[in-house]
């Protein structure tokens, strides 16, 4: 067990370092580069009246932005999460924590995840890999993770390709959907199911909604490729070649968003995967997302300083607001109907 615990910590350290220092971008595009807003030269709106507020998980957000799940479990991760939480609280945006599996075996790592005292008002999301339900993690333990950080929802992330390109990855993905349903029924808060960068298909979305999942985070291709991250972690040539061969795998974010929104007009959708700006986020809102998420650029900023992270988030918000004004959109509901060309 101790060896497994140490491996969890080592893997988390590797993931931070690789994401900060290596090119791990998918060779696929998100698809949003094909969408263009029709510029409104006479919007008849005061910039100060542009309203980016929304609600998520029963809480108010100043902008429809999620700091997507990244890290936890290490000293460096603690510092990153504290900065993320501080800035998220000030900006009024949501935040996800990295995978919390290590907390089930090493209770002392709670200090790297527990940020509610820093961010008392924002939606905060606990997180664990869904496949862990096939390896002994119980609904009761999922509730423990939620309670430990006073979370508003639990993310069950689907990372099948990442696991299969990890030498120590989990291989058994059989009969997982019934276990997800059990967690949904057991927990006192909503369950979010999230891909990690390869997209959710229409069929998978239908299955998850039928199981009672309340929010979907489609996390399509176009951003970080976790198989490429694992390629850098490979300890031999074969592992590296296997992982590297999936650099262009997945459903582009735009395609995944369209598929999932076709399944349900009502389910809240978080869209992430390849977003670099508030303009990209605005496009996602226009196509059917409720919230858009970013990770990579926030990670790099948070590893440096709170001030740099704050500037990065303010940049995204200002880009979103300017896009709204230049499309004649006073509110996010207006933006969802803005004129576009494909």
Swiss-Prot record:
EC number: 5.3.3.2
GO annotation terms (biological process): isoprenoid biosynthetic process
Record's keyword annotation contains Magnesium: yes
Residues binding substrate, per UniProt: 11-12, 99-101, 162
InterPro entries documented for this protein: Aldolase_TIM, FMN-dep_DH, IPdP_isomerase
Example of a GO MF term: NADPH binding
Cellular compartments annotated: Cytoplasm
A GO cellular-component term linked to this record: cytoplasm
Keywords attached to this entry: Cytoplasm, Flavoprotein, FMN, Isomerase, Isoprene biosynthesis, Magnesium, Metal-binding, NADP
Binding site residues for FMN: 68-71, 99, 127, 194, 224, 274-276, 295-296
Binding site for Mg(2+): 163
Domain of life: Bacteria
The protein's enzyme class: isomerase
Cofactor field: FMN; NADPH; Mg(2+)
Catalytic activity: isopentenyl diphosphate = dimethylallyl diphosphate
Family: Belongs to the IPP isomerase type 2 family.
Subunit structure and binding partners: Homooctamer. Dimer of tetramers.
PANTHER family in the record: ISOPENTENYL-DIPHOSPHATE DELTA-ISOMERASE
Entry function: Involved in the biosynthesis of isoprenoids. Catalyzes the 1,3-allylic rearrangement of the homoallylic substrate isopentenyl (IPP) to its allylic isomer, dimethylallyl diphosphate (DMAPP).
Protein name (database record): Isopentenyl-diphosphate delta-isomerase
Organism: Rickettsia conorii (strain ATCC VR-613 / Malish 7)
């Amino acid at each position: 067990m101790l060896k497994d615990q140490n491996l969890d910590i080592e893997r988390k350290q590797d993931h931070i370092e690789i994401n900060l220092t290596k090119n791990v971008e998918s060779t696929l595009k998100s698809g949003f580069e094909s969408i263009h807003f029709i510029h409104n030269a006479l919007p008849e709106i005061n910039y100060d009246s542009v309203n980016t507020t929304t609600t998520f998980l029963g809480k108010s957000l100043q902008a429809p932005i999620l700091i997507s799940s990244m890290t936890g479990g290490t000293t460096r991760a603690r510092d990153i999460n504290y900065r993320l939480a501080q800035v998220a609280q000030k900006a009024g945006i949501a935040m996800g924590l990295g995978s919390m599996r290590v907390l089930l075996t090493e209770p002392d790592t709670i200090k790297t995840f527990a940020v509610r005292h820093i961010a008392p008002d924002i939606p905060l999301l606990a997180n664990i890999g869904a496949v862990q339900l096939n390896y002994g993690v119980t609904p009761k333990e999922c509730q423990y993770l939620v309670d430990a950080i006073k979370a508003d929802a639990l993310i069950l992330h689907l990372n099948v390709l990442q696991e299969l390109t990890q030498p120590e990855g989990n291989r058994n993905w059989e009969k997982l959907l019934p276990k997800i349903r059990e967690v949904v029924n057991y927990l006192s808060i909503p369950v979010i199911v999230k891909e990690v960068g390869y997209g959710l298909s229409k069929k998978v979305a239908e299955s998850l909604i039928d199981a009672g999942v309340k929010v979907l985070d489609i996390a399509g291709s176009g951003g970080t490729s976790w198989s490429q991250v694992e390629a850098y972690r490979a300890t031999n040539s074969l592992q590296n070649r296997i992982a590297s061969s999936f650099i262009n795998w997945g459903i582009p974010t735009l395609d995944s968003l369209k598929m999932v929104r076709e399944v349900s007009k009502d389910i809240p959708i978080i869209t992430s995967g390849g977003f670099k700006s508030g303009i990209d986020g605005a496009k996602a809102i226009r196509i059917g997302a409720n919230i858009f998420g970013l990770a990579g650029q926030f990670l790099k900023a948070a590893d440096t300083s709170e001030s740099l992270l704050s500037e990065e988030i303010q940049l995204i918000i200002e880009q979103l607001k300017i896009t709204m004004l230049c499309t004649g959109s006073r509110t996010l509901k207006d933006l969802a109907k803005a004129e576009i060309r494909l």
